[in-house]
Amino acid sequence: DLLPYCEAIVSVWNLLGRRDNKYKARIKITVHEHGIDDIRARVEERFARIRPLFTGVDQALLAEITQAFAPPAYAETSLAAYDAARAANPAFRSWSDTNLSAHKNPDYAIVSVSLKKQGATPGDASADQMRVLADLAERFGHDELRISHEQNVILPHVAKGDLPDVYQALRAADLATANIGLISDIIACPGMDYCALATARSIPIAQQIAVRFDALKLEHDVGPLKIKISGCINACGHHHVGHIGILGLDRAGVENYQVTLGGDGTEDAAIGERAGPGFSAEEILPAVERLVLGYLDLRSDPEETFLQAFRRLGMEPFKAVLYPDKEDKRDAA
């Protein structure tokens, strides 16, 4: 039922979606304008008509796609070089702790190459760096690399024995930033610097946050924290599912940044809750710093992540650190 139901949703959106205004050519705008009940009724009616006509996916096409994504031929590999590098090189150990993910073959790893060096434009790579990545994919990655929605590059099949060489090549190309999943691994849309739809800048905000927390040397102490920044309501930066989401808006010609908390884009999906009034471009970095430092005080132990603490405590303790002036006025009253 899933595929025809998805087709029904797309068909209804195609029928009702706005074509007169590029700013409103989004399914969420259609749902907002027509209401979820009307959209649901239309989808169910369309699904009832097309479901009997669906006889299943084209098996030949499915087999062709499956073959295109077949796993490579894994070679047996020694882990000695990897284990020795972890023992002898703290920088390699830190990188492997953050930038490697488990592979279904225990002798291999999934390498996430961070394009989020502190102070750089999130997701940017130079032509020379792209050539290095292509060479690494050819030499060590079975000719495969992927671009993640988190604006990083993935080498999905790297033998652990080759990881020290991969790391050294990445380091030489200034691509060995060890921050995957940490504060400075920020998703940010192009914002007003490059996008005609944007109402606020995103890239400078991401750069300021990354530089600040690198200077504070708190990233690894804070642990997993997803900050996502969008420069307009189209939400290309996925701010609504950030642990800390930042939405840039235009308030009477002045950039204003709305903060949401508690979003999650994983299997425990949640839309972030708006914390309160927005902040100016000058205020948003101190606001994020207050949030993160407040979390360190609020968490039950060093293992409790920002998202876990938010789910345990709710919005109010975080709002108190985000808006200290309001709390001071409340105490004075």
Describe the role of every protein-language-model region.
Residues D1-A333:
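Peripheral terminal and linker regions in Fe-S/redox and tRNA-modifying enzymes
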